[in-house]
Curated annotation (Swiss-Prot):
Protein name: Probable glycine dehydrogenase (decarboxylating) subunit 1
Enzyme class: oxidoreductase
Family, similarity comment: Belongs to the GcvP family. N-terminal subunit subfamily.
Taxonomic source organism: Geobacillus thermodenitrificans (strain NG80-2)
Biological process, per Gene Ontology: glycine decarboxylation via glycine cleavage system; nucleoside metabolic process
Superkingdom, taxonomy of origin: Bacteria
NCBIfam families for the chain: PRK00451.1
Residues that span the membrane, as ranges: none
UniProt keyword annotation of Disulfide bond present: no
Reactions it catalyzes: N(6)-[(R)-lipoyl]-L-lysyl-[glycine-cleavage complex H protein] + glycine + H(+) = N(6)-[(R)-S(8)-aminomethyldihydrolipoyl]-L-lysyl-[glycine-cleavage complex H protein] + CO2
EC number: 1.4.4.2
Amino acid sequence: MLHRYLPMTEEDKQEMLKTIGVASIDELFADIPEQVRFRGELNVKRAKSEPELWKELSALADKNANARQYVSFLGAGVYDHYIPAVVDHVLMRSEFYTAYTPYQPEISQGELQAIFEFQTMVCELTGMDVANSSMYDGGTALAEAVLLSAAHTKRRKVLISNAVHPQYREVVRTYANGQRLEVKEIPYNGGVTDLEVLAAEMGDDVACVVIQYPNFFGQIEPLKAIEPLVHEKKSLFVVASNPLALGVLTPPGEFGADIVVGDMQPFGIPMQFGGPHCGYFAVKAPLMRKIPGRLVGQTTDEEGRRGFVLTLQAREQHIRRDKATSNICSNQALNALAASVALSALGKRGVKEMATMNMQKAHYAKSELQKRGLLSPFAGPFFNEFVIRLNQPVDDVNARLRQKGIIGGYNLGFDYPELANHMLVAVTELRTKEEIDRFVNELGDGHA
C-alpha cells in the first residue's frame, strides 16, 4: 500500500488503468490543459502515525466543554443523565447496529421485537394506547402531531403555548407553513399557560392545543384544567412531555390527552451536542390509523408461534406514496433501542427513583439559591428545571462559571426578551450535593 488509509497498491493502480484502456495517469487526464495542472508537492503536513493522530484529535475534542470534564447545569431539552453500561454493549451488536427497516419479518424478529418493546414502554409511560417505532426527535414528533390533528379535524388553526420549547415551536411553524396552517401562540402567566387567554381563543376552527408537560421553564402545566377547554370544542389535546418526568407525574393519557410526544434522550442517549436523539409518538386508539411512522405488532404464525411484524403498513410512504400519513422512514431505530435497553435496565422502580432524584435535587438547588437571594419569577410545582433571576447578563455569569469548571444554565433572554438576565437551571440525578453547593456558592459569591 502507498498509505495505510488509502489501501491501493501500485499493482492495483496498473490493473485499473489497463482495464479502462489507458497507459498512465497522465494519459487519463490528458484532456485537462497543461496550464491548469498542478505540478509539484501539495503544501500539506506530512501524514501522522496513529498515536500522533489520536493525540491531535483528542486535543481538538478537549477544546469543547463537555460533561465529563465540567459539572453541567444546562438542560433546555438535552440533559446529562446516567446511561447504564449495558446500553452500548447491546447497540454495538452488528445485527442491531447495521439493521435497516425490517421489511422481511422472517429474518428480522430480533429487531422487530426490540421495536415492539419500545412501543410498549412508551405506552406505559404516557398512558396511551398506541405508540410508533420512533420519530427523529421531540420537535419533529410535535410537528407531526400538529399535522395529524389538522388532517383528523379538517381544521387549520393551531394553538400552541408560548411555554413550549422555542425550538419545538419553530419546527411546528416550519411544518405548518407548508400545509398553510395558522399557528397562534398562547402567552404564559406565572410560568404556565394563561388559561384565560386559551379559553378566549378556543373556537370551532381550532385543530389542536399544544402544551408541554413539564414546560420549557420546568413548570408543571395544569393538564386537568386544560383538557375540558380543548375537548369542549372537539379539538385534539396534544402534549409534549419529558418521558423521565412521567416516572413521578400523572401520565398525560390519564388527563385525556389525544396525542403525546416527546424526546427519549433522557433514557440511554448521550447529549451528543444536541443530537441525534429519538422522538416518541403515542396516541389514543381512535387515531391509530393516522399515526405516522412504523408500527410493529405481535402476531402468531401458521404454526402457532409468537412473531412480530410491521402492521397497518397501508398508511406508510413505501405503499401510499404521496398519500401517506407522513414520509418518515427509518426513524431512529438504533436510538430507540438505546432507550429500550436503558428503560429495561432501570425497570419501573428504577425509573421512578431516577425521576424522584431529579426532582429532589432540583428543589434542593432552588432552595439554596433562594437563600442566597437568587429568586425565581415563577412559583408552583416543577420537575428538574427552574428559572432564576440574575443581576448580571447570563452570558457573563456562564463565562465565569466555565472558568470554575461549571457549565451554567440556559440564557432565557435568547428566546424571551422579557426574561433577559434569567437563567434556566437543570439538575439531574448525576449532580451531587457537593456539586450543587459549589454551583450555588459560585453564583452567590459573584453576586449573580
